[in-house]
Amino acid sequence: MTVRDLPADDVMELLAEHPRRLASITARVPAAQLLAAPSPGEWSANEVLAHIRSCADVWGRCIARMLAEDDPTIRAVSPRSYIDKTDYLDLQFKPSLRAFTQQRTELLAVLAELRPPEWMRTATVTGAGKALVRTVLFYGQWLADHERIHVGQIEQTVAAVRLTR
């Protein structure tokens, strides 16, 4: 996995921007269109948001553990498996986006208090091949970069579904 090497300030900016951008992209889109996939086998905007939320849960918990414990060992969890333990795929887009926005506000409040050394707190991640040492900054970068791709995907999905309706 390749994660862009972003400074903490850029991570914070991107993490704050994504919920706002999602709200802007979907503000005038009917609920039915947010549930529609652009073509068979592709995700609807709602499914992409559910995936974004699943990633935010999984990787956000890793960040929380690294801040609460000294060098914890964390078992890797796949957001694609974790999503099955949630109701995210069953939720309507707008309430799901509100919940995501609230969760993001809470994460940003925690991250805003970090001093530079705290961004470098570590965990050993096991269960997905070779054990890896990851930092709070790494998970922030991963989350920001991964979401950036999926926010763009939602924008493309909304445009594609709009054209077919």
Residue ranges of model-derived segments:
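Acidic/histidine-rich alpha-helical segments that form the ligand environment
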Residues: 15-18, 83-120, 141
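Extreme N-terminal tail/first-helix region
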Residues: 1-17
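Small-residue-biased structural context
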Residues: 12-14, 19, 86-93, 136, ...
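Acidic/His metal-coordination segments adjacent to aromatic residues that form catalytic metal sites
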Residues: 3-6, 42-45, 82-96, 128-137
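A glycine-rich, hydrophobic loop/mini-helix early in the fold
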Residues: 28-29, 39
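Short, contiguous alpha-helical
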Residues: 35-79, 108, 119-165
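A generic structural signal for well-ordered alpha-helical segments enriched in polar/charged residues
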Residues: 20, 24, 28, 65, ...
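Alpha-helical packing segments of well-folded alpha/beta enzyme cores
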Residues: 11, 18-22, 55, 59, ...
